[in-house]
C-alpha cells in the first residue's frame, strides 16, 4: 500500500521519480516550494502494513527529495484519512517525527486547516509548534466542517 512508503521498491521508486519531476517542474516555473501529500500511504486494516518499514521508507524518500532539490522548500501535507481509511502521516506529532528523523533544512510542513479539524487537533497549537521550529512552510485554509475534506473555500 502506498506510494513513497510502499513496501515494493519499484512502486516506491516510481513515486520518488514523480517527486523529482515535480521539483524539476517547480524550478522551470520559477517556484520555490513543492508540497507532498501522501494520499495513498496508509492502510485500511490494522497490521496491513509494516509500520516501521513504511516510516523508514518515508524518511529515506523525504531525504532523497530534499537532497535532490536543496534549493526548494519541500512541504509535507498530512491528513488523517482519505484516500486510505487511515493515512500513515496523520497527525502533527507523526509529521514532526518524520521531520526530525529526516533532518533536512529544507523539509517542513503545510498545515491544512480542515485536516487538523478532521483529526481534532488545535490549529493554533500546530501553528505554534511548527512555527517555533522554523518548519511551518504553508497553510491551506478551507472548510470541511471537521469530518471530511470537501475542499470548499471558507
Predicted regions located by residue number:
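Active-site glycine-centered loops adjacent to acidic/histidine catalytic or metal-binding residues
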Residues: 112
Amino acid at each position: 500500500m502506498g506510494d513513497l512508503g510502499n513496501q515494493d521498491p519499484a512502486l516506491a521508486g516510481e513515486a520518488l521519480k514523480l517527486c523529482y519531476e515535480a521539483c524539476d517542474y517547480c524550478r522551470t516555473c520559477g517556484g520555490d516550494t513543492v508540497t507532498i501529500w501522501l494520499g495513498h500511504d496508509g492502510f485500511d486494516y490494522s497490521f496491513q502494513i509494516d509500520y516501521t518499514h513504511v516510516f523508514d521508507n518515508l524518511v529515506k524518500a523525504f531525504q532523497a527529495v530534499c537532497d535532490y532539490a536543496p534549493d526548494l522548500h519541500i512541504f509535507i501535507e498530512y491528513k488523517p484519512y482519505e484516500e486510505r481509511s487511515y493515512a500513515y502521516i496523520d497527525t502533527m506529532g507523526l509529521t514532526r517525527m518524520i521531520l526530525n528523523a529526516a533532518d533536512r533544512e529544507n523539509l517542513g510542513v503545510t498545515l491544512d486547516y480542515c485536516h487538523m479539524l478532521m483529526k481534532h487537533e488545535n490549529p493554533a497549537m500546530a501553528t505554534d509548534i511548527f512555527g517555533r521550529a522554523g518548519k511551518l512552510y504553508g497553510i491551506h485554509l478551507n472548510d470541511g466542517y471537521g469530518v471530511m475534506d470537501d475542499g470548499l473555500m471558507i
